[in-house]
C-alpha cells in the first residue's frame, strides 16, 4: 500500500492546500484523484523547539519533518499513535539525539526514508530498524565509533537499502552470525577512522564509498565476497601508499574505480588490475602515480576512459591502419590522451 502512495505523490495535477496543524508546524495537504478523493499530508515541524514532541499529526500524514529542534530523546511512545502508522518519510536530522533502541521505530511499519544525520548517536543496537521497510537511511555526521551490521537487518529483506554512515568516528564494523545479512545496495563510509577495509562479505553491495579514511594499504582479499560491486570509491586517502597485486580480483562486475587524490600512492602494478574484466572508468587524478603500467590495458578489456595526473583524460579507441594488400585493414586498440591544453602522447602516460 505504501509504495502506491509514493507513486501518487508525483502524479501531475495534484492539488496542495494547508490545514490546521500543531502550533508552530505547517501541514500541507496533497489531494489526488479526479475528485480529490484521496489525500496525504506533509507535516513540517522543523525549528519549533524540543517541546514539539510528542506531536499530534493528521491521520493521513506521509512525511514528518522534526529537524533542528534540539530533541535529545526519541522513543517508541513519541513515534506512535494516530498518523504515525502511515509515515513514509521521517526527518530527525540536526537534533541532539544520543541513543535509540531496537523499539524506537518499531511502530513505523511503512517507513521508507529516515534521516538521523547530524545528531549525537554513539551506538546502534542490533535490529534498530527491524520492523520498518527502509530503503534510505542517513546516519552521517554522528558520533558512532563502531557499527554492527545486524543493526540494518530488516524483518522484510526484499527491498534494498541505501545507507550513509559518512563523517562519523567509525573504527570498525563487526558482524554476527545470528541475523540474516542485510540487503544493502549502497554504503557510504567516507570520513571515518577506518584503518583497513571492513569485512562486508556477502552483503549485496553495488556502491561502496571509503573516501577520506586513514587506510594505508589495500590488501589482497579486502573485497572478498563483494562480487556484485559496480562502483568503488577509494579517493582522498591521505595515508594510502600501497595497493597489493590482485586486490580487486574478486570484483568481476566493477565498472567504476576511483583512486583519485591519493598523493602517497606512487606506483601501481599491472597485477593490481587483475580480474577487473568489466571496469570501464578508472580515476587516478591527482594521485602520486608518476606513470601507468605499460601493459595496463591487458587486464582491462572493457576500459573506456582513464583520468590521470593533473587532469589528463585518456579514452580507448580502435585505430584502423591503411589497407594492406596481404593483411587488409588491421584494427588495434589505442589510448588517446589529452589535457586542458590539447593532446598528450600516450607514451608520456604509460
UniProtKB/Swiss-Prot annotation:
Q: Name one GO biological process term.
A: energy homeostasis
Tell me where in or outside the cell this protein is found: Secreted
UniProt xrefs under InterPro entries: Dev_Immune_Receptor, Leu-rich_rpt, Leu-rich_rpt_typical-subtyp, LRR_dom_sf
- Superkingdom: Eukaryota
Keywords, alphabetical: Developmental protein, Glycoprotein, Leucine-rich repeat, Neurogenesis, Repeat, Secreted, Signal
Give the range the annotation lists for the signal sequence: 1-17
Q: What is its main location?
A: secreted
Entry-linked SMART domains: LRR_TYP
Where does each LRR repeat begin and end?
60-81, 86-107, 110-131, 133-154, 159-180, 183-203, 204-225, 228-250, 253-275, 278-299
Query: Which Pfam families does the UniProt entry name for this protein?
Result: LRR_8
LRRNT domain residues are 18-59
- GO cellular-component term (any): extracellular space
> Which residues, renumbered to this chain, are glycosylated?
75, 91
Per the entry, what this protein does is: Contributes to various developmental events through its interactions with multiple signaling pathways. Dorsalizing factor which functions as an inhibitor of bone morphogenetic proteins (BMP) during gastrulation. Promotes dll1-dependent activation of Notch signaling and is required for neural crest formation. Induces endoderm and dorsal mesoderm formation by enhancing nodal2/Xnr2 activity while inhibiting ventrolateral mesoderm formation through inhibition of fgf8.
Matching PANTHER family = FISH-LIPS, ISOFORM E, SLIT RELATED LEUCINE-RICH REPEAT NEURONAL PROTEIN
Its UniProt miscellaneous note says: This factor is named 'Tsukushi' because its expression pattern in chick embryos is similar to the shape of the Japanese horsetail plant, tsukushi.
Query: Whom does it interact with, and what assembly results?
Result: Interacts with bmp4. Interacts with dll1 (via extracellular region). Interacts with fgf8; inhibits fgf8 signaling. Interacts with nodal2/Xnr2; enhances nodal2 activity.
The protein's name in its UniProt record = Tsukushi
Q: Which organism is it from?
A: Xenopus tropicalis (Western clawed frog)
Q: What is the lineage of its organism?
A: Eukaryota, Metazoa, Chordata, Craniata, Vertebrata
* The encoding gene: tsku
Amino acid at each position: 500500500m505504501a509504495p502506491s502512495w509514493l507513486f501518487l505523490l508525483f502524479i501531475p495535477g495534484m492539488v496542495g492546500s494547508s490545514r490546521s496543524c500543531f502550533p508552530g508546524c505547517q501541514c500541507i495537504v496533497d489531494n489526488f484523484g479526479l475528485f480529490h478523493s484521496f489525500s496525504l499530508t506533509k507535516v513540517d515541524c522543523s525549528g519549533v523547539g524540543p517541546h514539539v514532541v510528542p506531536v499530534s499529526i493528521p491521520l493521513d500524514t506521509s512525511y514528518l519533518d522534526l529537524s533542528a529542534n534540539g530533541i535529545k530523546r526519541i522513543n517508541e511512545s513519541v513515534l506512535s499513535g494516530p498518523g504515525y502508522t502511515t509515515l513514509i518519510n521521517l526527518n530527525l536530522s540536526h537534533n541532539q539525539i544520543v541513543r535509540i533502541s531496537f523499539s524506537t521505530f518499531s511502530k513505523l511499519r511503512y517507513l521508507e526514508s529516515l534521516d538521523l544525520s547530524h545528531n549525537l548517536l554513539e551506538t546502534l543496537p542490533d535490529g534498530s530498524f527491524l520492523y520498518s521497510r527502509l530503503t534510505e537511511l542517513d546516519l552521517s555526521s554522528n558520533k558512532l565509533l563502531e557499527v554492527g551490521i545486524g543493526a540494518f537487518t530488516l524483518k522484510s529483506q526484499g527491498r534494498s537499502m541505501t545507507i550513509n554512515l559518512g563523517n562519523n568516528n567509525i573504527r570498525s564494523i563487526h558482524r554476527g552470525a545470528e541475523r540474516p545479512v542485510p540487503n544493502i545496495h549502497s554504503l557510504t563510509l567516507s570520513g571515518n577512522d577506518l584503518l583497513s577495509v571492513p569485512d562486508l562479505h556477502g552483503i549485496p553491495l553495488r556502491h561502496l564509498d571509503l573516501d577520506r579514511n586513514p587506510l594505508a594499504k589495500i590488501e589482497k582479499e579486502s573485497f572478498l565476497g563483494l562480487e556484485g560491486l559496480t562502483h568503488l570509491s577509494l579517493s582522498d586517502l591521505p595515508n594510502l601508499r600501497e595497493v597489493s597485486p590482485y586486490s580487486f580480483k574478486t570484483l568481476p562486475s566493477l565498472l567504476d574505480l576511483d583512486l583519485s587524490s591519493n598523493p602517497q600512492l606512487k606506483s601501481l602494478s599491472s597485477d593490481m588490475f587483475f580480474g577487473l574484466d568489466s571496469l570501464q572508468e578508472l580515476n587516478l587524478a591527482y594521485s602520486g602515480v608518476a606513470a601507468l603500467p605499460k601493459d595496463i590495458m591487458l587486464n582491462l578489456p572493457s576500459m573506456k576512459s582513464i583520468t590521470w595526473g593533473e587532469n589528463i583524460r585518456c579514452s580507448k579507441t580502435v585505430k584502423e591502419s591503411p589497407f594492406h594488400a596481404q593483411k587488409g585493414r588491421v584494427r588495434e586498440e589505442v589510448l588517446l590522451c589529452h589535457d586542458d591544453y590539447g593532446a598528450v602522447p600516450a607514451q608520456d602516460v604509460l
